[in-house]
Amino acid sequence: MKFNTVALTLATAGSLVTAQHHHQHRHHQHKREDVVESSATVVQYELDGKPISLKQVCAGLADNTLKFANNDHPTGICDNLSSAAAPASTPEVTSAFAPAQFIELSSVVTSATPTSASSSETVQTPAASSSSASSSSTATGLDADFPDGELDCSTFPSEYGAIPLDYLKLGGWSGIQYVSYAGNFINDIVTAVAGDTCKDGAMCSYACPPGYQKSQWPSTQGATGQSVGGIECRNGKLHLTNPSLSKKLCIPGVGGVHVQNTLGETVAVCRTDYPGTESETIPIGLGGNDLQPLTCPDGETYYKWQGKTTSAQYYVNPKGVTPEKGCQWGDGTQPIGNWAPVNLGVGLNKGKWLSIFQNSPTTSEKLDFNIKIKGDNLSGSCKYENGVFYSETGSSSSGCTVQVMSGDATFVFY
């Protein structure tokens, strides 16, 4: 997927300058899916080098106090803007997101004091529930260093923060990759199926509780761009693959992002196991009024694909689907697993970015509930309601994105 950033510069008596930055990144598809390339455009309006909202742009154009540099005025940008007060605009995603992807969240926003988003809603958050299928209350040893090279490969490291996923029938692992090396690359990867084990030559990936993510992946990755993740089984023992990042198996995200379910029924939210098998096997089970942290990786320090920043992607299943059913590979007969209707994107890269988007072109199925992003200070609005995505600039069939300017933000299911 190509992710293009367009900066439109305004001036009180200036000339038009349009700068376009191309941030290419691979579209990481799950196994058995064809690679699909798509593009998205992010628009950022700047005045004197600082971002301003679309509302401010349109007001300035209307009263002739602002104009675009070089008179290159984009058409129709103010057509769908509501006359009601709106928070500072975030870059709007204007074309379809591709499915099963890891978006390189990037922007041309320069450092500046965030504009107050007066209409952003403050989230009234209940205490985090412990009913999640992967709740941190069930994790032990999160702060313990992993004993490198000591545990047998037949031992799942649940005493070191990892959460066993017994329903996948992989000995608790979230995914297993049997790899073969050719010089500085891995030239052959065989993905384990139910009943397989973590054995010599395997990279064995694992789930962490909400708010945490795995810290281990080898520096040697797939020769054709495949991602590889987990700890390594070598000579019958489990070994760390990324000890320079952490000697703990699970590390926290940057924090400040949550997911809340107000539906009264279970909802399974599933993170893609990345780097690794790229299947949506990392579960969060939300009960009727649960609030759980949603892990947001730091783009500067977390996994990079060919040097490019990646984000976390979550699949949202229909209500009533359990993590055991929804957080694994589906066959397409039901809108669950990799066929779930909607994805959430979360990442930190020159700002914290949150997205809601259709799992397209895998499916056009609609979710049977709504989602909105609420926060202390958001750059705009983003919600999914009755199968349509809405931002402060109008509606879309593909998705919407906001930046968290300050404070916390929550994806609310309602």
Curated annotation (Swiss-Prot):
Residues 1-19 form the signal peptide. GO terms for biological process: (1->3)-beta-D-glucan catabolic process; fungal-type cell wall organization; hyphal growth. Its EC number is 3.2.1.-. Optimum temperature is 37 degrees Celsius. Glycans are attached at residues 80, 377. The keyword Nucleotide-binding does not apply. It comes from the Eukaryota. It is an enzyme of class 3 (hydrolase). Keywords: Carbohydrate metabolism, Cell wall, Cell wall biogenesis/degradation, Glycoprotein, Glycosidase, Hydrolase, Polysaccharide degradation, Secreted, Signal. GO terms for molecular function: carbohydrate binding; hydrolase activity, acting on glycosyl bonds. It holds the Pfam family SUN. One of its GO terms (cellular component) is fungal-type cell wall. Disruption phenotype: Leads to smaller colonies and swollen and vacuolated hyphae with double cell wall and leaky tips. Also leads to decreased conidiation. Induction: Expression was detected 4h after the initiation of spore germination and during mycelial growth. Residues 115-141 are annotated as: Disordered. Highly glycosylated. Residues 115-140 have a biased composition (Low complexity). It is found in: Secreted, Cell wall; Secreted. Belongs to the SUN family. Cell surface beta-glucosidase involved in cell wall biosynthesis and septation, and thus required for normal growth and correct hyphal morphogenesis. Has hydrolytic activity on linear (1->3)-beta-D-glucans such as laminaribiose and other laminarioligosaccharides. Also has a minor transferase activity. This is Secreted beta-glucosidase sun1. The lineage of its organism: Eukaryota, Fungi, Dikarya, Ascomycota, Pezizomycotina.
